[in-house]
Amino acid sequence: MNIRNVVIALILTLAPASIGAQESETVYNFLRLPVSAHVAAIGGENISLAEDDATMIFHNPALISGVSDKTINLNYMTYMEGAKNVSASFIKLAGERSSWGVSAQLMDYGRINQTTDYNESLGKFSARDIAIGGTFAYELTDRISGGITAKFITSTIADYNSLAIGIDLGINYLDIDRGWSLSAVARNLGGQIKAYEDEFERIPFDLQVGVSKRLMNSPLRFHATLSRLTDWDEAFGRHIAIGADVLLGENIYLAAGYNFRKAQQMSISDNDGSSAHGAGLSLGAGISLQRFKLHIGWGKYHVSTSSLLINISYTL
């Protein structure tokens, strides 16, 4: 089996999800997808959502400092036809100021048609990506937390596989009294240690900064995140994701957001001009009880279909 034919088939299948130039130059782009349904709902990019939410281990390792002890979390995301994204995490306190967590993520692309250079069918092959991580976070002061995640990443395409090591570094400043949360994250530092064949490829490094602001004496909270701050080949607006929450008491929220990059990447030209067909827009809601939490988010990450994200967390 020729890896060239296999990779071409996979690229053609996944191309609508990776329209940007930076995606086409990196591997393991499933790491760019949101895991948190709440993050998905407020624009698909967020690193400053400082809540008791175990899914933030996938977005900013510093934020597990605010997660309840012994919290287990299960997640599911629909993607394009035949593909699924599942993940899980567990958070444990380790003293008054430190926390640790473990996480795992699987993107299964299902069975994909393989063809020759002359479009002759050679049957089907499977492809999947897996990331397994360990996280440590520490409260440096009463308002500042830092965290690190070390990830082992593997990808299999038919009979070929690759391995990589990735590091996430995060910091968060949280002022509860004034409703401010500010964060900075460097995601996916590292690289491949085993290539599919002979050529090593880059993993999707992303430098991000973000802010969340709760309007005091109001149910409104706003979010803004700047991503891919080392790539300025694209317009400034494409680096921005924004969102807002309506907090209905202490336990329920409604959320909406907009991601300018997704809207432009997945815009489709038609007779009336260019239309994103809902790409960029996201919605969601969640409920938090004493031990049980349920979050649901909706957004578009592939031109062929929208995605539904479901998070379930339980504190033991």
Where are the predicted features?
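Bacterial N-terminal signal peptides that target proteins for export
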Residues: 1-7
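Subset of outer-membrane beta-barrel
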Residues: 22-316
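N-terminal signal peptide c-region/cleavage motif recognized by signal peptidases
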Residues: 15-16
